[in-house]
């Protein structure tokens, strides 16, 4: 069966369209279907001086596009797009691309969804509450809990909490929360990654993982009891370990993922190890979703200088995961 990937460029004034146009010059082993405004894509291709053929998407087609072309689901813009210049009026367009791509994954027409970078600030400036792709797709699919994973060669990092203030992290780390998060990670490592018995390494929340309660009690009161209960069910867990020692080869060679308690505990290490070579994967959704690990890079839009590395890896990972679930 031909793998069909739904691809959203994200912020139209950013580098998302550029990256997709550039990557379309390659031959891929999947149908790449971009959910975007056709005129925007043509204009950006002309600005980049890259030839691009847009093929109207038809659900009955299964032939992979030739290099230099993309299938497209044409979605209307609200206003003109100027590369590098944010326009809140087009925020609804961004959400329309995400909504349509999500719905067509939910109905089984596509095998995976790959997303380009959005600008959360301009969407909120338009009066639309938006905290990120991950939360948006969870709401769209009626999924009560999802988990953010970022992966690069030799390292996968998952997050117990995502886009919340550091001051709110401790209260968000509860036994039910950890129970849900770890079950999702274990399930998706088995079903989407094909890992028969995943081994999850878990960070503590506090420095030195709490130092036996002397530097915070979250480990003793919450994290350790949650891990022990899950171990009784056969889930393989190591931790909680101090975050400043868990990311070393002794542990990483055994770990299928490292679970960090909050965003900036785990992701700086991941991005240092795999800058421009990492992929964002949402666990817990009823479909495969991968994304770039970078922002909109407005200053690089239409310059031809944007690095395609992360977007390329996001597409390759989506194809790999789709094949493993066929």
Swiss-Prot record:
One of its GO terms (biological process) is pyridoxine biosynthetic process. GO terms for molecular function: 4-hydroxythreonine-4-phosphate dehydrogenase activity; cobalt ion binding; magnesium ion binding; NAD binding; zinc ion binding. Its main location: cytoplasm. Pathway: Cofactor biosynthesis; pyridoxine 5'-phosphate biosynthesis; pyridoxine 5'-phosphate from D-erythrose 4-phosphate: step 4/5. It is found in: Cytoplasm. PANTHER family: 4-HYDROXYTHREONINE-4-PHOSPHATE DEHYDROGENASE. This is 4-hydroxythreonine-4-phosphate dehydrogenase. It comes from Pseudoalteromonas atlantica (strain T6c / ATCC BAA-1087). The gene is pdxA.
């Amino acid at each position: 069966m031909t793998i069909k990937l739904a691809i959203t460029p994200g912020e139209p004034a950013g580098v998302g369209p550029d990256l997709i146009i550039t990557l379309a010059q390659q031959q891929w082993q999947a149908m790449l279907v971009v959910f975007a405004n056709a005129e925007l894509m043509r204009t950006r291709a002309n600005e980049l001086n890259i030839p691009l053929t847009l093929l109207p998407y038809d659900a009955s087609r299964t032939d992979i596009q030739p290099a230099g072309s993309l299938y497209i689901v044409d979605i209307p813009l609200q206003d003109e797009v100027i590369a590098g210049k944010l326009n809140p009026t087009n925020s609804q367009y961004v959400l329309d691309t995400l909504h349509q791509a999500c719905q067509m994954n939910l109905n089984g027409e596509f095998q995976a969804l790959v997303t380009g970078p959005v600008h959360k600030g301009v969407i909120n400036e338009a009066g639309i509450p938006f905290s990120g792709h991950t939360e948006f797709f969870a709401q769209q699919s009626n999924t009560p809990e999802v988990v953010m994973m970022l992966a690069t060669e030799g390292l996968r990092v998952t997050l117990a909490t995502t886009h919340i203030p550091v001051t709110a992290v401790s209260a968000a780390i509860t036994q039910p929360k950890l129970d849900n998060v770890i079950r999702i990670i274990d399930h998706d490592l088995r079903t989407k990654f094909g890992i028969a018995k995943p081994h999850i390494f878990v960070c503590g929340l506090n420095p030195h993982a709490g130092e036996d309660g002397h530097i915070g009690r979250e480990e003793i009161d919450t994290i350790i009891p949650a891990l022990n209960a899950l171990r009784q069910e056969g889930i393989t867990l190591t931790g909680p370990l101090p975050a400043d020692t868990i990311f070393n080869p002794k542990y990483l060679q055994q770990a299928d993922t490292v679970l960090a308690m909050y965003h900036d505990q785990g992701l700086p290490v991941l991005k240092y190890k795999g800058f421009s070579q990492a992929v964002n994967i949402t666990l817990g959704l009823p479909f495969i979703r991968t994304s770039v690990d970078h922002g909109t890079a407005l200053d690089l839009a239409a310059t031809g200088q944007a690095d395609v590395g992360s977007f390329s890896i996001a597409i390759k990972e989506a194809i790999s995961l789709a094949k493993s679930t066929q």
